[in-house]
From Swiss-Prot:
Annotated positions binding UTP: L111, A112, G113, G114, K125, Q199, G225, D256, K380
UniProt-listed PANTHER family: UDP- GLUCOSE PYROPHOSPHORYLASE (PTHR11952), UDP-N-ACETYLHEXOSAMINE PYROPHOSPHORYLASE-LIKE PROTEIN 1 (PTHR11952:SF6)
InterPro entries for the chain: Nucleotide-diphossugar_trans, UDP-sugar_pyrophosphorylase, UDPGP_fam
Alphabetized GO MF terms: uridylyltransferase activity
Keywords for this protein: Nucleotidyltransferase, Transferase
Family according to the record: Belongs to the UDPGP type 1 family.
Protein name per Swiss-Prot or TrEMBL: UDP-N-acetylhexosamine pyrophosphorylase-like protein 1
Motif Substrate binding: positions: 111-114, 306-307
EC number of the protein: 2.7.7.-
Binding-site positions, substrate: N226, K410
Length: 507
């Protein structure tokens, strides 16, 4: 272990020796832990990180200069659509996706390094329940979608396939996530096919360029953003693991989208048939000022431009069809070939831009007292997963229906949008639509049949509560055999047990 003298000299070179100012107050165990943490922060890298953070924090936020002359929508030939395509084309994409899944060439990779702080909880977001009748968590919904898509591929191709699930966690979420999965028997997935790994952490920095102590014996650290994926892949030999399994295509997504379709065969098939090395699902922006990044081209290169970087004038520009010109909203749902990820980790990762996040970072003051600031006092530097789009040789975007595939969980219920209630309603509304399309009808509390025209209730809930397990249907398929011609009382849960009861005897 590095000595106090060595660590202090290292910190002095970095201009960060204040991190040891409470060393004399600490017990032996706390001293050892602090020295170990500080020794891992290499002096030159620490100095550069703190200087870059302070410099970036001093820049005025706002629209990028000269963006109007540099910005273009993606060329039409680079964009596919699950909404506007004909049925034959969609089936061709889906069939190719299922073929690749059946050949064990597809993996999913979950970005799960963030805590549920904005939700008012201290545990990982994936462990959160939004209040579904089944009380399923985000992790369970996602695990069951993996099981179902494997089952569908096997049924179509006559195989026994595996979709490995890679989960990138952080120092905050790794332990709780492992414990949660073990407690729930990995949701009946083979544990050898669930690979958890940890992203790097970076010190939070004051506006003056000083690393922050959150306790006398602990530096305030934060995950290096979802773009930390590329270092983490290299740190933990994840690409080597994928190669050994025969994985060629990776579906990367964020933990907080309750409607996410893991290993979506339509998306996978589209990207593969296009020969893409990198792809992004997008949804049409709801309105010009919607706070989502835009997938577009800057100087002829594909990338995501954050909503804060686009002026209102550009955001409101209309295209020839009368819709928004820059309407491809990014939803953190991406396709990569393993070969592309390998090149990124070896060559391009150091070129990724660092993004600034101003945060309220708890700290200890000069007397060693804990302070919880009421306004941002620190800078956390992050990399974004989508900043590799610029390095793709064949980038594509794939438009999907927001109501079917995107409802993120960002805030608690005091917020107007992206909260547990909006997520719950989005999923239940989807399942209600699926049930109607399968030929079911619902009864209200008085036993009166609801009409198909029955609108959403004043609170945003569907007219009847219906939840369909991902183990029964992945995207609305196969429900007719259970629901055709049936009258259902709300609330109705179609899980595997209920499906067995409703299944016709001759099936």
């Amino acid at each position: 272990m590095d000595s106090e003298r060595d660590v202090r000299a290292q910190l002095q070179r970095a201009g960060q020796d204040h991190l040891l100012r409470f060393y004399a107050d600490l017990a032996p165990e706390a001293r050892a832990a602090l020295l170990a943490e500080l020794a891992s922060l290499e002096a030159d890298a620490l100095r550069e990180h703190c200087q870059r953070a302070a410099a970036a924090g001093a820049l005025a936020p706002g629209p990028l200069p000269d963006l109007a002359a540099r910005l273009q929508p993606l060329p039409p030939e680079r964009v596919g659509s699950a909404i506007r395509c004909d049925q034959e084309t969609r089936l061709r994409w889906e069939e190719e996706g299922f073929r690749q899944i059946s050949l064990n060439k597809v993996a999913v990779l979950l970005l799960a390094g963030g805590q549920g702080t904005r939700l008012g909880v201290t545990y990982p977001k994936g462990m959160y329940q939004v209040g579904l009748p089944s009380q399923k968590t985000l992790y369970q919904l996602q695990a069951e979608r993996i099981r179902r898509v494997q089952q569908l591929a096997d049924q179509r191709q006559g195989t026994h396939c595996t979709v490995p699930w890679y989960i990138m966690t952080s120092e905050f979420t790794l332990g709780p996530t492992i414990k949660f999965f073990k407690e729930h028997d990995f949701f009946h997935l083979d544990p050898t096919n669930v690979v958890l790994f940890e992203q790097r952490m970076l010190p939070a920095v004051t506006f003056e360029g000083k690393a922050i102590l959150e306790r006398k014996d602990k530096v305030a650290m934060a995950p290096d953003g979802n773009g930390g994926l590329y270092c983490a892949l290299a740190d933990h030999q994840i690409l080597e693991d994928m190669k050994q399994r025969g994985v060629e295509f990776v579906h990367v997504y964020c933990v907080d989208n309750i409607l996410v379709r893991l290993a979506d065969p339509v998306f996978i098939g589209f990207c593969v048939l296009q020969g893409a090395d990198c792809g992004a699902k997008v949804v049409e922006k709801a309105y010009p000022e919607e706070p989502v990044g835009v997938v577009c081209q800057v100087d002829g290169v594909p990338q995501v431009v954050e909503y804060s970087e686009i002026s209102p004038e550009i955001a409101g520009q209309l295209g020839a069809d009368g819709g928004l010109l820059y309407n491809a909203g990014n939803i953190c749902n991406h396709f990569f070939t393993r070969g592309f990820l390998d090149v990124v980790t070896r060559e391009f990762e150091p070129l990724l831009r660092l993004h600034v996040a101003m945060k309220k970072v708890p700290y200890v003051d000069e007397e060693g007292n804990l302070v919880k600031p009421l306004r941002p006092n620190g800078i956390k530097m992050e990399k974004f997963v989508f900043d590799v789009f610029q390095f793709a040789k064949n980038f594509v975007a794939f438009e999907v229906c927001r109501e079917e595939e995107f409802s993120p969980l960002k805030n608690d219920d005091t917020a107007d949008r992206d909260n547990p209630s909006t997520c719950r309603r989005a999923l239940l509304a989807q399942h209600y639509r699926w049930a109607l399309q399968a030929g079911a009808r619902f009864l209200d509390v008085h036993g009166v049949q609801l009409t198909e025209q029955s609108g959403m209730l004043p609170n945003g809930d569907p007219p009847a509560i219906c939840e369909i397990s991902p183990l029964v249907s992945y995207s609305g398929e196969g429900l007719e055999m259970y629901l055709q011609g049936r009258q259902l009382q709300s609330p109705f849960i179609l899980d595997e047990d209920q499906a067995r009861l409703l299944r016709p005897q001759d099936c």
